[in-house]
Every structure is written in structure tokens, then in C-alpha cells.
Amino acid sequence: MSEAEARMRGHDAYDLIEDEFNQDLNRSLGPTGPDGLFGRVADMALPSGAVVVDVGCGEGEHAVELATRFGFQVIGVDPVRRCVDAARLLAPPGCPVNFAIGTSELLPLPSGSADLIWCRDVLSLVEDQDGAYSEFRRVLKPGGRAVICQTFATSLLEPGEAAFLLPAMGCSASAMRPETTEAAINQAGLRIERRVVLGSDWGEYYQEHVPERCGHLLHAARLLREPERYITRFGKQNYDIKLGDCLWHVYCMIGKLSSRVYLLSAPNEVGMPGPTAGSAEPGG
């Protein structure tokens, strides 16, 4: 049998199962979505009134949710004044949350003051991973916890793709390598209790449950098809940021980028031996 005949026979066989294959692909794999991070916090059973720091809080959505859902005393920290001002407006009256200017490497809190650090989708922007995780260790109480969500490049991300994407998104190349981050965690004396590889979990969740937020592939196609249309109206820098954001979401879906959730703990006593790696698991 020739190679061409073998290919044709393979396609003939595929035709027999194509409909069944498509039906199976249309069945959900049960993605958990980002709300699963709050489930991780719930599992920690921290008491109401626990002090929680939202590092890189943006406009305050997660900080307010942590305060209202769990009754935590939350301090949201962000380096951007506009975000901090917006976060203060978001917080409802009586909500136990405050916001302040600061960075992951210089948090405006005393040492040993926090029960939990929450940091989602921020540390890819931070070149000084050692400084950030050392600061987390400083601020955490003995036995304090951290929930970190960070996105990394995989071996599927081509050098040319990275050369555009990382500057457009303001990311540090070294921070996009998990080995850099895990070395920083260990150097800081924090323990990795659990490492959760998200893969496409969150992207699938949004596709299934919030489809109106999932136009990234279509938008990327339009941006690439007629760049001058959008550059002329919005400027080259804004064009690059928008294209980068669209590609970021697409790359997360197809495995060129992959997020991880780290559940960390500080030693129970000052001066305890260094950390050891904890367990790894897939999914959200």
C-alpha cells in the first residue's frame, strides 16, 4: 500500500467516527474556573477577622470578595493610584477592606502581620521574584498562608511569539519561567504545600459559562488582518497591548502559556529549616 493510499484509508476510517468524536468533544470536561481559588481559601478555614493582603489588587474586585465572603480584614495593595482610587469606590460601606499604594517587593505592612497573602495574575510582571517572595515571607505571620496564581510560558511558545508578547504585556522573561519562581519561593523560606497546574481550565470555563468574554481569537484575527485600521485610531502601543491580551488568552487555551496555583505556607517558627516541595495536582 502506498503512502497516499494509507492516508486515504485513514480518512475513510475517520469519517466513520467523526460525528461521535464531535459529540464527545461537545461534552464539558468540568472546568472549575477562577472561583475555585476562593474554594482553596475556604479549605484553609481561616477565622473571620483574619488579616489578608491582596497583592496587586487592581480595582479591588478580589479584595472586596474576600472581605464580604469570609469576613476577613483585607488590605489591597497596588502600585497604580488610579486602581487604588477605583477600588476604594468599589468597596461598599462597612466592608472590612482598605487599599494602599505599594508593590509586591515593598508592601506597606509590618512584619508578621498577615494570615494570608492572595496574589492573582500579577507576578508575571515582576522581574524581582526573589524580592517579591521574600517580602511575602516577611509580612506573613508564622504559619501564615499564601494563594498565588501565576502564568508561565511553556516549551510550545516560540521565541518570536515571546519576543512580541512579553513586552506588549509588560512581563518579565525570567518571571515567565516556573523554575525561577520556585527557586524564589524556596529561597524565601516558604513551603509549597500544593502546586496546581491549570492548563486550559479557566479558558474552558469562560467558553462554557461566560461566552461573551471569549472573543479573543476573533479579535486577534481582526487585529492581524487590518492592523493599520486600529493603529490609526488607537495608536501603536494600544494596538500592541490589545493584540497581546488577545494572544495571551488564545495561548493559554492551546498550551503555549499555562497558569499555576501555588498554595504556600510560612514556617511556624522563626528560623525553622528550609522548605520542601509539596504535592502537585492538575486542574483548578
Functional labels for PLM-detected ranges:
Residues 53, 59-106:
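Class I SAM-dependent methyltransferase SAM/SAH-binding core
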Residues 118:
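A conserved beta-strand element that flanks and buttresses the S-adenosyl-L-methionine
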Residues 1-20:
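N-terminal, positively charged/glycine-rich alpha-helical extensions of SAM-dependent methyltransferases
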Residues 130-145:
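A short glycine-rich, Lys/Arg-flanked "PGG" loop and its adjoining helix->strand segment in the class I
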Residues 21-38:
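Conserved SAM-binding loop and adjacent beta-strand
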Residues 196-284:
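Conserved Class I S-adenosyl-L-methionine
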